[in-house]
């Protein structure tokens, strides 16, 4: 597979838009894109708001943004940070996603479409919990 960088170093810095939902998990809450501190790949879409919230014993991740043409996007994922695949709804580029906790501030993510890995990445929340960095790498499946 030929690798291509989606978001090159999609050093997406986000700032918490609301108080943390769960004090023991720095990922929880609503994160908003700070374009001034982000390195976005030209011609790609962007996630402007990402919300993590408790859903029973799982986590619901809701992502809103725009596609490469500026049209609104919305997708949702509900699952656990256990490295297993859970369904994604609303995203034409993926149908499954998994997150796995690397440490208290880092999640590893894998994105799939039709059973094939189409992307991997990491989500890292800063030590002070006020920003996060998302780096993704896509593959030509």
Question: Regions from the language model: what does each represent?
Answer:
Residues 20-141:
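Hydrophobic small-molecule pocket/channel-lining residues, especially in calycin-type beta-barrels
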């Amino acid at each position: 597979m030929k690798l291509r960088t989606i978001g090159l170093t999609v050093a997406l810095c986000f700032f918490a838009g609301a108080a943390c939902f769960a004090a023991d998990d720095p990922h929880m809450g609503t994160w908003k894109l700070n374009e001034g501190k982000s390195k976005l790949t030209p011609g790609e879409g962007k996630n402007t708001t990402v919300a993590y919230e408790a859903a029973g014993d799982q986590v619901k991740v809701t992502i809103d943004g725009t596609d490469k043409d500026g049209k609104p996007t919305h997708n949702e994922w509900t699952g656990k940070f256990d490295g297993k695949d859970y369904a994604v709804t609303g995203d034409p580029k993926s149908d499954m996603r998994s997150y796995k906790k690397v440490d208290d501030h880092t999640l590893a993510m894998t994105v799939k479409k039709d059973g094939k890995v189409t992307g991997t990445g990491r989500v890292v929340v800063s030590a002070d919990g006020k920003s996060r960095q998302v780096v993704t790498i896509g593959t030509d499946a």
